[in-house]
């Protein structure tokens, strides 16, 4: 595979995640409004996951469009994490299938990290915008993993699976940088 094809695969993967996020918002908005009339806590339990579903693909897509392959890794890690959490809490749905497809697209383009321009952390040559977006993605992933189990107790197993996958991804990149 050449780098242009890998780049296109990455854009398709994150665009798919963004479409899934909009679909999710449309499906769950009426349910949230109805549930909030009975219990306002429902909004707080659902708000963070819904916001993070939007932030992950947007920040990842912007990073990737700026030729920063780290955006694809972070989005894929998030997709794996959300898929595991969703499967354990609500079973197999269209949302989970979309996440699985995103992960498959990511795996197909994993060799992009062998390219010289790959960056996974702060880079003195990068613009402040690139570094800020990279940090934002890490914040979304880490905060969701830490706060997620408190807000959504049914997803403990998914959180653990997501954290393990994230640690494996980190370990892989530490190995690549040496």
Predicted regions and their residues:
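Topology signature of small-to-medium multi-pass alpha-helical membrane proteins
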Residues: 1-178
